[in-house]
Amino acid sequence: MEALLVLPLLLLLSAGPCAPQLLGIRGDALEKSCLQLPLDCDDIYAQGYQADGVYLIYPSGPSVPVPVFCDMTTEGGKWTVFQKRFNGSVSFFRGWNDYKLGFGRADGEYWLGLQNMHLLTLKQKYELRVDLEDFENNTAFAKYADFSISPNAVSAEEDGYTLYVSGFEDGGAGDSLTYHSGQKFSTFDRDQDLFVQNCAALSSGAFWFRSCHFANLNGFYLGGSHLSYANGINWAQWKGFYYSLKRTEMKIRRA
């Protein structure tokens, strides 16, 4: 499994409570006074770091720094990106443990991890933005005023990291995600959807499948139009089930 790392391991291990924040993928250490460890990109923005790039956040406490890409530009910034795809360099057809803990590199394609996402939404209220781009360079987005992962569960994993979204706002992409609200997350090795077959295997990905999907943003990177049904990076309400998108970002910001 690829670890969800981008910054040098030595820097990660030395990042104590008073360590300077690391700005962008360059790893420039700025001289700052001792700051509270950031939970998310909202905190990082508030601390004065307002450039797009990779930063460290601490959703599970001070001993576990997590690299994350912060979008500080789009619509006022402060977005914590938890899913990013743009070139097919990272396989997203993975098992449960990878999706639970995260994989890829925060300066490239990556998945932040279901447990990290749960811990974030347990502590704050978030909105969600989904940015999409096709191979003809058309862009669209969808926004949701409320986003959370198993907010009331004693054990989020036993609850299946259930998705809750509401308050759709159209940015040209249409609503392909509300259909999935209330569903548990499924991978090919942990089938928790409502279909008699394995939706993750059929869709070549992992998602909050129902039976099966209108959104499949973790599907195969197929490079535009494809003959196979619904197993690419699909957002059905924008491009249907036979078009795999070029770029996707799923990101959250405090509401």
UniProtKB/Swiss-Prot annotation:
One of its GO terms (biological process) is elastic fiber assembly. A motif (Cell attachment site) lies at residues 26-28. Glycans are attached at N87, N137. Coiled coil: none annotated. Its main location: secreted. PROSITE patterns: FIBRINOGEN_C_2. Keywords: Calcium, Cell adhesion, Extracellular matrix, Glycoprotein, Secreted, Signal. Residues 32-255 form the Fibrinogen C-terminal domain. SUPFAM superfamilies: Fibrinogen C-terminal domain-like. It is found in: Secreted, Extracellular space, Extracellular matrix. SMART domains: FBG. InterPro entries: Fibrinogen-like_C, Fibrinogen_a/b/g_C_1, Fibrinogen_a/b/g_C_dom, Fibrinogen_C-term_domain. Residues 1-20 form the signal peptide. GO terms for cellular component: collagen-containing extracellular matrix; elastic fiber; extracellular space. Homodimer. Can also form higher oligomers. Interacts with FBN1, FBN2 and LOX. Interacts with COL1A1 in a Ca (2+)-dependent manner. Interacts with ELN in a Ca (2+)-dependent manner; this interaction promotes ELN self-assembly. PANTHER family: FIBRINOGEN/TENASCIN/ANGIOPOEITIN (PTHR19143), MICROFIBRIL-ASSOCIATED GLYCOPROTEIN 4 (PTHR19143:SF225). Could be involved in calcium-dependent cell adhesion or intercellular interactions. May contribute to the elastic fiber assembly and/or maintenance. This is Microfibril-associated glycoprotein 4. It comes from Bos taurus (Bovine). The lineage of its organism: Eukaryota, Metazoa, Chordata, Craniata, Vertebrata. The gene is MFAP4.
